[in-house]
């Protein structure tokens, strides 16, 4: 659905996203990316390239990844994951 007020939608989106930190894909994340990709390839359990980027950034920053995509991210060794749909 296209908005009739794209400027307003963009402003609201920016307000929402400003509440969160954005972590970069830096050298540490690139190293993690290679390590994870090689490990998963050796075990025949690859994950999608975007999920691989997300996992690498989380590991490089020692961050907990909050997701409902447990099937993919459970394959990544050392990654701390929380399912946002599971009650605490």
Predicted segments with their positions:
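PIN-domain endoribonuclease scaffold, especially VapC-family toxins
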Residues: 1-56, 80, 85-88
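C-terminal structural segments of small proteins and small subunits
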Residues: 60, 64, 68-73
């Amino acid at each position: 659905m296209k908005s009739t007020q794209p400027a307003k939608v963009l402003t609201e989106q920016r307000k929402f996203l400003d509440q969160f930190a954005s972590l970069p894909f830096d050298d540490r994340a690139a190293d993690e990316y290679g390590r994870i990709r090689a490990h998963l390839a050796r075990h025949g359990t690859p994950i999608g390239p975007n999920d691989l980027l997300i996992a690498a950034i989380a590991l490089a920053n020692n961050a907990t990844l909050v997701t409902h995509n447990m099937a993919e991210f459970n394959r990544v060794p050392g990654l701390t994951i929380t399912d946002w749909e599971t009650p605490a």
